[in-house]
């Protein structure tokens, strides 16, 4: 028996087509989406966003602010065993600690990190390492079910990067527990300046120290800022020289091996290469980046790093330095470095005292008020 719905039937008035779903992202202009993507910055998160829709995929390459976090370090030997599916020993499975024990291993790691696929191989006998990011497309190495690829492979998908920050999983310099060592360097086609802050030990403030520090100003330095004789005889000066040379080697290696990225991404206004530990920071602004593209750098014949020019150095030292928050730096040392040919004002120390974030910024400001010692270093 057929059922006929008449126009007077109340059921008929309630039958209507289902409205189409509204995608509110379609109502947002591209400029707003790009603002969101630029605030995200992280290259992994942006990669996930790019697979959401064709529109997102077309906008991601226009992102100007990119942050690349390096997840792991895998030596070439380990990479070969991974690709061939051969069993690996426990020590080979954990190259991270061994690679970052000495200065030169991570320098090789940076070299492999910044090499593009298909580029010429390194000389035989060398055993460089790769800095890799997990996840994403076009991976090169699979480890433990996770696909890895180099940051340069990721960056080639971006066309308009202006602000790029790369973070290594650890500082290059192996230092003892409790030792403070931080450096910040600026480069053009060569080293423009470098500031190094070190201390043989750091004593954190106690609760009583914090209370006293909040209620009283920092006491004035009682000595005249002179370096004690024991500094020269107990190995203190030698240790500071090692810190200085090691920091300069690490900085010059980072600079040398950033060349491919700098050459390819001509829209860059700022490039920062740092590490999770906050040990070292290499910075380049737009003028410095352009200088490197125009003026070829001088490479060291001994290793893959930029040649460090002849240097003038100023050193400040305090056997014990108490900061406003109660922290005490034992054997506090500040070294300000510029090329010997630098024409900038010698007495200007503003770039030195502003090199580090707090609480170490105030340490630099306190140290530059002490007696200055001048040193020179040949090119290396």
Swiss-Prot record:
Gene3D superfamilies: 1.20.1280.50. Pfam families: F-box-like. It comes from the Eukaryota. Residues 22-70 form the F-box domain. InterPro entries: AUF1-like, F-box-like_dom_sf, F-box_dom. This is F-box protein At4g18380. It comes from Arabidopsis thaliana (Mouse-ear cress). Signal peptide: none annotated.
